[in-house]
Amino acid sequence: MDVIQRIITLDRRSKGFYIITNDLVKKLPELKSFSSGTVNFFIQHTSAALTINENWDADTRADMNDILDKIVPESAGYRHTAEGLDDMPAHVKSSLIGPSLTVPITNGKLSLGTWQDIQLAEFRRQPHSRTIVCTIIGLRSN
């Protein structure tokens, strides 16, 4: 059993849902050497999250953004506003979606379904770079 951990910094992005699967895989060349295992992705931020969702239709990403804005509106009268009106809603959305994902590895590839991709959910309007800790645990190919 081998363990590899990498810290990946994603480019700055403003509010929205972004497919980042290829960005992550490109920065994890060791992934190809694992016959089986898991990889955990953990975002080190409280105003962004990680999720797995549909990759085919960009409208799903826009709809996710719109739905979360309705569930957690900026106009709810939050006490925590020191970093802007979008900050506290970003914290709530991040807590609802979550900071981490675990994906199986099969024959050197992420075992995602046909229509699945890993997505960054960025909840702040101003662009931010985001840091993700990636931990691979598994068996290497012979």
UniProtKB/Swiss-Prot annotation:
Pfam family, one: UPF0047
Signal peptide interval: none
PROSITE patterns for the chain: UPF0047
UniProt feature coiled coil, ranges: none
InterPro entries found in the cross-reference section: UPF0047_YjbQ-like, YjbQ-like_sf
Transmembrane annotation, as ranges: none
GO terms for cellular component: cytosol; nucleus
NCBIfam families per record: TIGR00149_YjbQ
PANTHER family cross-referenced by the UniProt entry: UNCHARACTERIZED PROTEIN YJBQ-RELATED (PTHR30615), UPF0047 PROTEIN C4A8.02C (PTHR30615:SF8)
Family, as annotated: Belongs to the UPF0047 family.
Name this polypeptide is given: UPF0047 protein C4A8.02c
Species assigned in the record: Schizosaccharomyces pombe (strain 972 / ATCC 24843)
